[in-house]
Amino acid sequence: MQTTRIAMEDASFPYRLGTDCAEDVVARLAALEASSYLVVADTTVAELYGAALTAHIDKEAGPSHLLTHEVGEVHKTLATVSALAEQALGRGADRRSVVVALGGGVTGNIAGLMASLLFRGIRLVHVPTTVVAMLDSVLSLKQAVNTTFGKNLAGTFYQPVEVLADTAALRTLPPREIRSGMGEVVKNALAIRPAMLDRLAGALRPDTRYDDETMRWIIAESLAAKADVTSGDKHERRSGLVLEYGHTAGHAIEHASRGAVAHGAGVAVGMTLAAEVSRRLGHADAGLVALHRELVAAAGVEPAVPDHVDTALVKNWLAYDNKRGYLDSPPGHTPMVLLSAPGEVLHTGTMPLVPVPLALLEEVVDESAARGGAGGGAAEPAAARTGPVPDGPEAAVPATPGPVPAGPAAAAPLPSGPAPTAPAAAGPVP
């Protein structure tokens, strides 16, 4: 496996990338000499890879336990984390255990948050199986779950001991999830590494047929892009905020779509909206907007808000974006990452954010939705999935943000798998 050292201020960990390298993955896990390996996966990934991986770990590394959760963003909640932690403790987890996050961004966040909380922190290894996870989410120290107010609002910062990525896992992904990953790749090129735009434009495939060499190049460029903005900002609160490009509207579209729009596809559409907002504010020209739409379309995502997504819900979620508070924005404004040209991020003081009137952003959302028409925008049927967990929502979210008694945390069932075997009163309270 090819190793890249990911360095963010005082945080550092190896990212190991290969193809058809399952034996190397297990060898790296064995080198950690854990008392047990807590493999966290959703039910789809568990069926595809869970039994084989845990059997290999049992043989070569030590005892392993497969802890599963239901598929989808709607299950990325504190309730799921708590249920998995109870299972882990019931199966004998201790301070020398290692949490292995096997799956996409949803699983990575759930497992990462659990690792940060068990015994106030045990070792975490990411084994990503989606494009978004390989080139984006596992490169962040942010481990967060959703609340009824929005995405990723409850969490911690926690560092993995390493990332072990085998691109062979991408072969089982449906086109929807490949396109989702390419949305994040386009973001990296437009906002951080414009030098990769020419090659990327020729490499993008709407049919999602990427060879291993191209995929490894895409992942390597994304690692470099992330390093460009996080090497001095491990918590992504200053220069690292550039990684939020397209996410203000993208998260709102994703959340409001109730599973029809995957995360990266939402970000892709969100970037086209951000480019149009920048143009209307006088910061960018029509050429930048056209470039955004061309690249998003080349990635296989229609560059418009899908016509079946309720724009009223999208506009509702815009007001709850997780970048609130970074700027002292006037009333009726929300902070956004905007570009004036590829790689040219607008700043307010030292912050790569600009306060944008919500009324303007809402107008751009409405116009994009009207343009989406019968084409369906960024949506694809979630039922088309044949591979690992997608990185976007897969089930209903609350119709409007706010404390709803029957919100995701209340509705999410306990993860599948045996209940804790230890008596409720056994052992000291952690």
Swiss-Prot record:
Entry keyword set: Antibiotic biosynthesis, Cobalt, Lyase, Metal-binding, NAD
Pfam families according to UniProt: DHQ_synthase, DHQS_C
Transmembrane segments: none
Group of enzyme by EC: lyase
Co-factor remark: Binds 1 Co(2+) ion per subunit.
Pathway the protein takes part in: Metabolic intermediate biosynthesis; 2-deoxystreptamine biosynthesis; 2-deoxystreptamine from D-glucose 6-phosphate: step 1/4; Antibiotic biosynthesis; neomycin biosynthesis
Region named Disordered: 371-430
Cofactor(s) this protein requires: NAD(+); Co(2+)
Binding site for Co(2+): 184, 247, 263
Catalytic residues of the enzyme: 142, 244
Superkingdom of this protein's organism: Bacteria
InterPro entries according to UniProt: Dehydroquinate_synthase, DHQS/DOIS_N, DHQS_C
Compositionally skewed regions (Low complexity) per UniProt: 379-399
Protein name (database record): 2-deoxy-scyllo-inosose synthase
Native species: Streptomyces fradiae
Gene this protein is translated from: neoC
